């Protein structure tokens, strides 16, 4: 994928955290079990954190790892800046295409993360939590996609996955 070197990036739309599991007593939920719990929470209106022993919490150990991502040229020296570019592009599109669009953030994590939907591990893959309206992404997912599943497409595939998660945000905002 080609990036315009002069493109300005807004790193405030991307946050990150690493490790940790949030409040004590929580159990990490991943894979199909995690998806089922989140779906049940969405349809039945309950806190999935109650099922795994604890109350829901927001992202822990938040850092500003993306502050150095200022322009498209920064992607050449720091590949992680591409997540800022994807997020900025997706938010720009929806801000123009959907009247009343409410921006959200992409939260990059490693290992596991506590969300308003409960604690999730990298086994869950990228997901959107409607309770806190945040897109969550463990970048190791893309490595796994390539190494274990043979996926190809590079940056375009990554952007597609993130855009898909933002689609859940749009559904949440519009009630569809």
Which residues are covered by each model-predicted region?
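Acidic helix-start/capping segments at beta-turn-to-alpha-helix junctions
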Residues: 67-92, 99-120
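Short pre-active-site segment immediately N-terminal to the catalytic Zn-binding motif
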Residues: 141-160
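Long amphipathic alpha-helical segments used for membrane anchoring, targeting, substrate engagement
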Residues: 1-68
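A mature extracytoplasmic/lumenal domain signature
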Residues: 110, 139-141, 174-175
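Short, solvent-exposed loop/turn and secondary-structure capping segments
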Residues: 52, 148-149, 172
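Structural recognition of the beta-strand scaffold that forms the well-ordered cores
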Residues: 27-30, 135-138, 169
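Active-site recognition of the HExxH zinc-binding catalytic motif
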Residues: 39, 94, 137, 160-173
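Catalytic zinc-binding patch centered on the HExxH motif and its immediate surroundings
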Residues: 54, 112-138
């Amino acid at each position: 994928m080609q990036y315009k070197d002069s493109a300005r990036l807004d790193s405030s739309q991307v946050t990150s955290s690493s490790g940790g599991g949030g409040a004590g007593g929580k159990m990490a939920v991943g894979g199909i079990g995690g998806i089922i719990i989140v779906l049940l929470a969405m349809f039945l209106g309950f806190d999935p954190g109650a099922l795994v022993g604890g109350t829901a919490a927001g992202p822990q150990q938040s850092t500003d790892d993306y502050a150095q991502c200022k322009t498209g040229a920064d992607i050449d020296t720091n590949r992680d800046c591409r997540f800022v570019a994807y997020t900025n592009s997706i938010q720009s599109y929806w801000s123009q295409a959907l009247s009343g669009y409410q921006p959200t953030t992409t939260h990059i994590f490693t290992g596991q993360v506590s969300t308003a939907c409960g604690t999730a591990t990298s086994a869950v893959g990228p997901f959107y939590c409607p309770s806190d309206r945040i897109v969550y992404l463990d970048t190791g997912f893309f490595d796994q996609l390539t190494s274990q599943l043979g996926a190809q497409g590079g940056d375009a595939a990554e952007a597609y996955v993130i855009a898909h998660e933002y689609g859940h945000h749009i559904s949440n905002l519009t009630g569809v």
